[in-house]
Curated annotation (Swiss-Prot):
Family: To M.tuberculosis Rv3790.
Source organism per UniProt: Streptomyces coelicolor
InterPro entries cross-referenced by the UniProt entry: FAD-bd_PCMH (IPR016166), FAD-bd_PCMH-like_sf (IPR036318), FAD-bd_PCMH_sub2 (IPR016169), FAD_lactone_oxidase-like (IPR010031), Oxid_FAD_bind_N (IPR006094), Vanillyl_alc_oxidase_C-sub2 (IPR016171)
Lineage start: Bacteria, Bacillati, Actinomycetota, Actinomycetes, Kitasatosporales
Residues in FAD-binding PCMH-type domain copies: 1-96
One Gene Ontology term of the molecular function aspect: oxidoreductase activity, acting on the CH-OH group of donors, oxygen as acceptor
Name of the featured protein: Uncharacterized protein in mprA 5'region
Xref: SUPFAM superfamilies: FAD-binding/transporter-associated domain-like (SSF56176)
Amino acid sequence: ITLHRLAELVLPLGWFVPVPPGEERVTVGGAVGADLHGPNHHRAGSFARHLLAFELLTADGTVHVVDRGTPLFDATTGGLGLTGVVLTATLQLQPVATSLLLTGSARATDLDDLMARLCDADLRHTYASARVDLLARGAATGRGTVLHADHAPPEALPARLARRPLAARPQLPAPPQLPPGLVPQLTPDRPLGRRALGLLHDLRHRAAPRRRAGTLRGLAAALPVLDGGHALGRGEGTVAYRCAVGHGCEDVLRHLVRRVADEGCATRPGLLKRFGVGSPGWLSFPARGWGLSLELPARATGLTALLDELDEEVAAAGGRVCLARDSRVRPELLDAMYPLLDDFRELRAAVDPSSVFTSDLARRLGL
């Protein structure tokens, strides 16, 4: 079952999933394998924090009941499906009083302003993230918009909605999108591409209100926006890059954003989050600090060299890339990014010595 469908089933009963997915296709088993995180990580942590137990089918055909605090639990949450197949899961849901969110936003002039506003939003709100303009340079490098939301209390609903506070709400229109096919024609490696995209990003930034609060939106419409699902445009072929660095590594984050902006290869905004307490998962991605998500055109000139450079800087700072979205990180950097990698390999060899459950990523990285 997908988390989206689970949320549809439990919301009328006054419950909601503890970590909302950014898209509809994420299954419960997939959320376990990726140790899913969302725009509420600064408060709620990742999916494993709300997972009480699960049943796991291992390669020898045995079904294990896996409880929290065990090595198999820690290897499987974030383990990318390499320890076995999750058959059932016992999950702690979160209570909600309505099916609506109170949303808001704040515009930031540069990356330091954006980080400061995101820190403030994390203290005040359940969900928070920030869109980063990756084409702005100079004094405006890293400018963007902080987005935040909270579950609306019944008293915040107008009378027509208060009569059925938990009713499913129709999806509201998404923010204006570029016409299909336009973004690929404006990618930075084509004539006028960077200038045209830069102008579009600039217009969008200037059109955004300096501050907005108290806008009611349905859960299904608001949460994908907070997780970057409605960011401006999508290229016809992109490489996902997700990295995390700890608190105190803000200079590293500044350099990553500046390098991408200087290359001018981004076609859509990046997504910045603050991560809270990390998960016990041995290969779990989120760790206390900052998370940056990028979608870059696969055909961008020099992209491989750029991402290799970012990998090295992230690893040197004690950070990591997200393996659930990776297709290219070099194996020799993995030990620095995931200190418990050898523990994972040892346990996986014990429960699946013939590598019945494997993947291209596992073979490439020697997991």
